[in-house]
Every structure is written in C-alpha cells, then in structure tokens.
Amino acid sequence: MRHDTDPRPSTADLIDAVLDAPPPRPEVSEVGRVAELGDGIAIVTGLARALADEVLDFASGVSGIVFDLEPGRLGVVLLGPSQNVAMGEDVRRTGRVVSVPVGPATLGRVVDALGRPRDERDPVTDSPLAPVEAEAPDILSRTPVSRPLATGLKAVDAAVPVGLGQRQLIIGDRQTGKTSIAVDTILNQKDTGVICIYCAIGQRGDAVAKVIGALQGGEMLGQTVVIAAGDEDAPGLAYIAPYAAMSVAESFAAQGRDVLVVLDDLTHHARTYRELSLLLRRPPGREAFPGDIFYVHARLLERAGQFGEGAGSITALPVVETQAENLSAYIPTNLISITDGQIYLSPKLVRTNQFPAVDLGVSVSRVGGKAQARAFRAVGGNLRVTLSQFEELEEFARFGTRLDEDTRARLARGGAVRNALRQAERDPMAAHEQLAVLVAAMEGLLDGMDEAAAGAAMQAIRAAIRAADGGLPEIIAGDEKLTEDARGHILATARAALAQTGRGDGADA
C-alpha cells in the first residue's frame, strides 16, 4: 500500500526528468601514441590534425611542442624529462600554444621557461598568459633610438653607448666577463625605472645563483624577472626560454615601460636548437646547424626596439661566446649582422688585468651614438683616438726603440686613459662621475700613475665630484654640451682631490 507521504519520486516523474534533461555530449579528444623516444624529443603517431607549435599532453604528465609535421607522424620537443615518457603511452592534443605568465606579478621572481617557480615560492597566479612566440612589431610601429641606456661602465657609456630600444651584442671568449657586463648594466638601472629581465640559457645552477645573489645585493631583484633554463633542464625549455623572456618584456613595454632583456647566452641556445634538429633528422647545414638558425635568432631579436609614443621600449643584450677569438664563426657572424653593434671582450686585455676587457678597436655601436649625451661625445671620440695611438706606439716601444719626448708623453697619456677605463665588478658609476674621471685622464691628471695609484686617484675624484655642486648631472640629463666652464670645474675639483691625497703632482698643468 503506497502512502501519499512517500518522498520517493514516481516512475512517471523519473521518466519525465530523463526526457526533459539535455542530451549528453560525448567528450571527443584526439589521442595519439608515442612511437619513438630520444633525448628531449618524441615521435608521435595518430594525431593527423595537430598543428605546428601546438602543445601536446603526454599521459605521464610531460608536455611537448609540435616541431615537425610529417605524413603519419609528428616530431615533438619535450618540455620535461624524456625518461618520464614511455613508449606507446597516450598523447592528447590541447589546441593551445606554449604560454607564459606575464605582468607585475612576475617581478622579483625566479621562474623557468614556462613560468613555474624556481625560488621555492608559490606559483605565479592571477597573471595573464602570453604566447612565447609572437610576431615582431612592423616598421611603422617603431621609432628611432634616441634615449640613452646608462650601463654604469665607463668603457661602454663613453665609447660604445647603448640606447633604449637597441640590440647590442656582448661577445667574447669564455671567462672574459660577458655576464659581468650584463649584470652590472642591470644593477645600474636601480633608480631609472627600467624593468630588467635576465634569461639564463643552459647555464650551471651555481652561475645562476651567483647572478641572483648579485641582484639581491644590489637591491635590484624586485625590479627584475629571472628566467632560468639550466643545463640540467630539458632542451625544449632552453629553446623556448629567450622567447618567453621577450613575451614578458612585451607585456611591460605595452604599458609604456622601458625594458632591458639580457639573453645569456645565445651560443647555448643555438647548440640546443642544433641538438633538437639533428635528433628530429632535420637536414644539417654549416657547422651542423639547421638552415633556419639565422631566422630562429632574427625573429627573436626583432621583437626588441623603441616603439611608438607611449608604447615603451625593449633593449636586448644578447650574449654570445666565441672560441679562440674567432669572430667569423657561424653563430657570431649571424648575431653581429642581426644586432645594432657589439661589445667585444678581448682575452688579451683580460691577461693584462684590464676589466672590463672591452676592446674599443673592435667594439661598435651603430645607433647608440645618436642617443649618447652630448657631454660624452667629444670625450668618447678622443678616447678612441688616444687608445688607438697608444696601442700602436706600445708595440714599437717593446722593441726597445729610442723614443722621443712626444712619443713618451703619448705613451704616458694612453696608459693613464687605459687605467681610467678599469672598473671593478658590481660598481656601476653615475654618468657625471664617469665624465669627471675621463676628463681628468684625458687632460693628463693621471699620467705617470701605476694601476693602484690610478685606482685610488679615481676614487678620490669620484668622491670630490659627488660632493661638489657643479651642475654636471643637470648638464648630462639636459643633453647639453660640456662647456669650458664645466670642464674647468671638473679639472679644478679633480686637482684639489688629488692634492689632498698627495698625488697632485701627476697633473698636467
């Protein structure tokens, strides 16, 4: 006997509910299989509709990027450990491309090429995602480089100036100080408002930790994004790392900010791309690099530039390593032709304890001169001439040739200028301090001093020029020429400082 208070629905109610419910929608997914495995790559079959650069998800939790499209098979670059992937495991399409978190939440963070934390902090959340690959801005959206980017290094700011929006290559053999120049440039942006991005490609973990420590010590980590793809990571992460760095930079530039991107280094990036291409059986070319290696770096560096009004800028400092000072190797020549100039670090100068070891005879800035402060231009031009004459005369002097008074004076002046260009690591100098030291050296105030004495004299001049109120910072900031009155003020201040240290007799009155 059925009671009216029975809470159970009747059969008729159940039938009506089923009929009124929307029809079920089957979940359709394309599933492939792993057919081959290599070091950092996989060959996948069964995904005929996959697109180039699409992300694929493997059943093991590793993701990969479609690199090669061939009939019946896909060449996939893995973004995780290949040892975690098994033969025959399922692979699914995602319909999306590789993206990275961008925006203010990334500042002060150390992340990998996918934006995953490397600093033992929480994941970057509440941030928009941007594809790591993007088209470079067209010509009409760019404006000429016209504003300086101060590196804080005398040898660079005076003779090889860099402008906001420029692509300036840092090139040299191993252990010549390439990373030091890049890090010192970042440290010099502390009070400029420039957002900095340091991208480590294939670097050892201890080397990256050293850079992070320097940024923390210089109170610049909060203004910097560190993207690290170490030598222990999957090759695919090292490949996409510089593109991810550019995407993060573009997000800030779109907000009108000036951004500095250091890519350390593109030699490792090129080797990684060669390794992946050979594993995927792409035809090798010169030095076994694939034929599109130039395009790989060109499309990356073309994303930097000075953009339209209110759109900010991206300054790129790519680093490349040479072997035995061979500037004509394949990758160095490619990057020299892509960029707007190069800062060449010479092993010969390193052996003479000249740091930074910038060889001004080979280094050049093709567009930065237009952005250089006028006060520096005359000093920088004379600097190159003086050093060039000094190096030529120095070669003759080694043969013991008898030298006349004028030649000895030129050698003394050249040695003083070379000493003036020495600078310790992690000690970027303000522009007016650089100008004061260089003017003092060019006018002979440091002639006859050895390296130690010249270092002490430069410190005294820096302290004195900081304490003096000569209007030098305003002259540089206002892009004014260095007047005779300003030059006289520099020399008077420098002579007084040297006199107090007991080294005033080195001045050339």
Curated annotation (Swiss-Prot):
Its membrane topology: Peripheral membrane protein
Swiss-Prot/TrEMBL site (Required for activity) positions: S363
Domain of life: Bacteria
Entry's Gene Ontology molecular function annotations: ADP binding; ATP binding; proton-transporting ATP synthase activity, rotational mechanism
InterPro entries named among the record's database cross-references: ATP_synth_asu-like_sf, ATP_synth_asu_C, ATP_synth_asu_C_sf, ATP_synth_F1_a_nt-bd_dom, ATP_synth_F1_asu, ATPase_F1/V1/A1_a/bsu_N, ATPase_F1/V1/A1_a/bsu_N_sf, ATPase_F1/V1/A1_a/bsu_nucl-bd
Localization per record: Cell inner membrane
Record keywords: ATP synthesis, ATP-binding, Cell inner membrane, Cell membrane, CF(1), Hydrogen ion transport, Ion transport, Membrane, Nucleotide-binding, Translocase, Transport
Function: Produces ATP from ADP in the presence of a proton gradient across the membrane. The alpha chain is a regulatory subunit.
Protein name per Swiss-Prot or TrEMBL: ATP synthase subunit alpha 1
Organismal lineage: Bacteria, Pseudomonadati, Pseudomonadota, Alphaproteobacteria, Rhodobacterales
